Amino acid sequence: MSYAKVLGATNRQDGYLEGNGYLVSWCIGHLVELAPPNVYDAKYVKWSIADLPILPEKWQYLVSASTQKQFGILQKLMHRPDVESIVNSCDSGREGELIFRLVYQQAGCKKPVSRLWLSSMEENAIREGFANLKPSTEYDALYNAALCRERADWMVGINASRLFSCLYGQPLAVGRVMTPVLAM
């Protein structure tokens, strides 16, 4: 991991590296995801046109079953007493912003966050990036754009899949990206 090398965090632990006063860890894709419909209301276990559309009033999130271990490691690291602040070094883009912020929120962390924004993983670029960290708030619009995309995809996927599955009588997966790609 290039960040760890540049920072001198070379002592490998379970799910992170530590050294030189730094902890370096990672996300494995989307560790935190939107809850399925049945979390909002048990009636959604059964698919019925009468229950559509499903439009959550307050969005709920769950830690992905496949990433619970790494989420637990991140949560524990965020709450360590010797950790004063956190650097979001997830991918530079809206999905990286979303991935980090959902983990941070789900972990219940309140520590200050800075953003590392890189277009290169070369050592010099990493050093320069760490020397020029930005306040996380400068990326709020990017995070909000990612939230909108995620929630729109969820609503289209859940509602359209259930509608067409009920009409067709067999399970069908419908989604914003899937449908145009299949139509090509």
Q: Where do the language-model regions lie?
A:
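Prokaryote-biased recognition of long, low-complexity C-terminal linker/tail segments
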Residues: 153-184
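Intrinsically disordered, low-complexity regulatory segments
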Residues: 1-150, 154, 180-183
